[in-house]
């Protein structure tokens, strides 16, 4: 397995946020994480990426701590976090500047990342000159430049309009098609989850536990066809029912506290 979450629990002060969360991400697999608000999804992603140490349990990337530079992973957030004074090309190159790559090798990696995200013709543009969707593409290209084993994505499309979100979902499908890179994808949008993921991990209300793991029985290419729409909608409804049950139970607990 590329990525392992092994009995992860976490608390902030006296507040339990995650409780005994375990799952795996195989090489080239995409796992979506969904659940009610406040269930610890972003906290879990920070632990998987080595930004936060769990109170209990462990995360491993190819048998080593996730912040081990030999097994790179990288984040794509809702906030693009681009350097406004740098061009698109310079933003994509930024994470490579202090690596062992020489200038020619860095340029080759940047060129490839720009090509894969459709940004080759925008390399000289500045972030303020780009739409929200294009800025998010720059963020994705920057993530791809480090050649990650795992891409960690936290609501990467939530700030975008529906048309741009659809275009970027198609981009993600294309980028993940060769199976060389896995991903963990946090989203509130269940359509995104069933379109992009191989499996969906449903977390319970806080403290987040694994309520259920739902497998998507189609390839991502098959999900784009008209015949798949009914099956995908059924899966969305299944996920929504699970999350709704957790949200209702959480509200009852508050009322009886």
Residue ranges and their predicted role:
Residues 145-149:
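A short, proline-enriched helix->beta-strand linker immediately N-terminal to the Walker B motif
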Residues 57-68:
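Conserved ABC transporter NBD signature motif
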Residues 97, 104-122, 174:
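Conserved ABC ATPase "signature" region
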Residues 34-36:
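The feature captures the beta-strand-to-loop junction immediately N-terminal to the Walker
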Residues 86-94:
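Short coil-to-helix segment of the ABC ATPase nucleotide-binding domain corresponding to the Q-loop/switch region
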Residues 49:
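Helix-to-loop junction immediately C-terminal to a conserved catalytic motif
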Residues 126-130, 134:
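Conserved ABC ATPase signature
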């Amino acid at each position: 397995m590329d990525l392992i979450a092994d009995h992860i629990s976490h608390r902030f002060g006296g507040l339990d946020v995650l409780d005994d969360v375990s799952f795996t991400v195989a090489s080239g697999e995409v796992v979506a994480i969904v659940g009610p608000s406040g269930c610890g999804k972003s906290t879990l992603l920070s632990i998987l990426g080595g930004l936060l140490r769990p109170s209990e349990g462990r995360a491993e990337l190819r048998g080593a701590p996730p912040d081990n530079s030999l097994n790179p992973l990288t984040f794509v957030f809702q906030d693009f976090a681009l350097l406004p004074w740098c061009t698109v090309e310079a933003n994509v190159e930024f994470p490579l500047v202090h690596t062992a790559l020489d200038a020619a090798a860095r340029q080759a990696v940047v060129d490839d990342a720009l090509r894969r995200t459709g940004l080759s013709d925008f390399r000289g543009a500045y972030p303020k000159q780009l739409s929200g969707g294009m800025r998010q593409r720059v963020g994705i290209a920057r993530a791809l430049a480090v050649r990650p084993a795992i891409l960690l994505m936290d609501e990467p499309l939530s700030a975008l309009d529906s048309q741009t979100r659809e275009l970027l979902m198609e981009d993600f499908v294309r980028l993940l098609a060769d199976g060389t890179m896995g991903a963990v994808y946090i989203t509130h949008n269940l359509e995104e989850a069933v379109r992009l993921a191989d499996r969906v991990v449903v977390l319970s209300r806080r403290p987040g536990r694994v309520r259920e793991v739902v497998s998507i029985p189609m390839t991502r290419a098959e999900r784009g066809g008209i015949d798949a729409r009914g099956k995908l909608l059924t899966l969305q409804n299944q996920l929504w029912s699970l999350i709704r049950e957790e949200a209702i139970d959480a509200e009852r607990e508050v009322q009886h506290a």
